[in-house]
Amino acid sequence: MQIQFIRAVQFSLLIKLDGRLREFNFRKIRNSEVETFSVNVCNERGDRIFFDMKKQDSSWDFTPSNLPGWIEQNKKVIRQAVEDELPNW
């Protein structure tokens, strides 16, 4: 009997957006043909915002598309933070 271990990738990043430091939690979804992360972050009221990031053609796409403006306006910063963190995993 052979045991196979599959690493669960999960990390948090503090990213400064619009003058506020926000904690983004990332969890890599296994069993996916496309590299995908489930992401959650709190807004100003403490409500959790959930979305997915999928790697398509060397760029990260965000789903759903109806995200708050402060996420929409800072997608480039979030993408870069993820790209900087991934080599550590």
Please place each PLM-identified region on the residue numbering:
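Negatively charged, low-complexity tracts enriched in Asp/Glu with abundant Ser/Thr
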Residues: 1-32
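Extended aliphatic helical segments
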Residues: 9, 34, 39-41, 77, ...
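Acidic, low-complexity intrinsically disordered segments
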Residues: 47-89
